[in-house]
Amino acid sequence: MKIINKLISSILTLAIVFSLSACLFIPDPGNNDDLSTKEKIEASVNATVENDTYNYNYVYLYLKAWGIKDFDANKFFSYELIFISKYNFGEGLPDRLTHAANTVNHFIENYYDNIDLENKAEVTDALLYSYVYNVGDKYAFYRTAEEYEDHKQELSGKFGGIGIQVEYDHANKTILINQVFEDGPAYEAGLKVGDYVIGVDGKTLDELGGYQNALNFVRGEAGTDVTVTVDRKGEKIDITVTRDLITESSVTYKLLENKYGYIRISSFKDNTAGQFREAVEALEDLGAVGYIFDVRTNPGGYVRTAVDIISYILPSNKKVMSYQYKGESKRAYYTSTDTLPEDEGLLGDHVIDLPMVIICDERTASAAEIFVSALRDYDGRVEDIIDLTIVGQNTYGKGIVQDTFGYTLDGSTVTFTTSYFCPPSEVNFHGVGIAPDVFVKYDETGDDQLDEAVNQLEILLNQ
């Protein structure tokens, strides 16, 4: 009995250290051999919440006492404290008891039967996946060290895979292909933009553990095969693709008729700004008289990369965006002449002083919207220093910023929303998007948006 009392005392002490609300009595869970089943855990947690007996942290200590012995409480609570101090979205964190119950139920439903409950790391990962899933931020992710390395590799522009760019469709809980790299493995196998990935190697997304895990299954060693199941306009299709080493080019360009420079930016990755510079230099050498920047289906990427590219277009010391962390004063990014390392840097105070047109659509999001809104604001909203017309459709409307925080002991990370951001005009567009100057709906039979962009560039040149 003394041992049990010491155990309970230790649990209470740990709860006091990490809890942000009043400490309440935690009853002895009894005989774990008899009661440590997922049904008992679920029932006891639900009863706990209904009776308002415990605060948020207590539920997890209670869960541990009911038979899930080996999760890393220090790691879990470290991440919880990061969320509490930094999370800045909507009304903030949800009600702690409700969130706790949802997290436990999600853990039981999705992980309890599929993990080794004696594996400390596996249990902790599962709890943190569930924690983040239920926080209320659709842009929040928990990643293990391996998953985070894969994520960084993807944003570096080099990775092993099949040559597609995707985004998570939250409404349909599936993965939308928004770009297929020309002449890549997926392109050769027949995958298309607009396909919805619903399975990999015979397993559904739920069976794979969700969005991030599904992406990890698509990737693999070059030369190996993967079968991707897609929904194409209601038809279920299995397509086998042979993986290859993918070096992604996020910027493509060409000189159109009348010497109109066309630059397509598919995402904002580590190597995108350098590629953009090369594209502009090449088109300048070809005598471009104006530019069309195409950011349709661009889901965003690194804010810093968007700032670097804008720095190559606008003069120095122009505000690009402002943002504000929880409890802190407002900060801002400005254009600069030394934004990248020297080996691929934007050297010198380069300015594009030719007419410009941007093409955007409903999948232009996040950092891509920073690009659109900042240039728009310098066409008369805050200063009138460029000639610009925006063509296409209303953008996605993601006017928030996510940051990533790591746990140094094992390399895992959490990413979640930390601030809203505003373009130079200081008008946030989250949930609203950016309206084009000239609305043109995309037509699958042709590219009416590009045709109109060419028309608008001609108008600007003839003013």
Predicted regions and their residues:
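Extended, small/polar residue-biased N-terminal targeting/export presequences
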Residues: 53, 64-171, 225-226, 233-240, ...
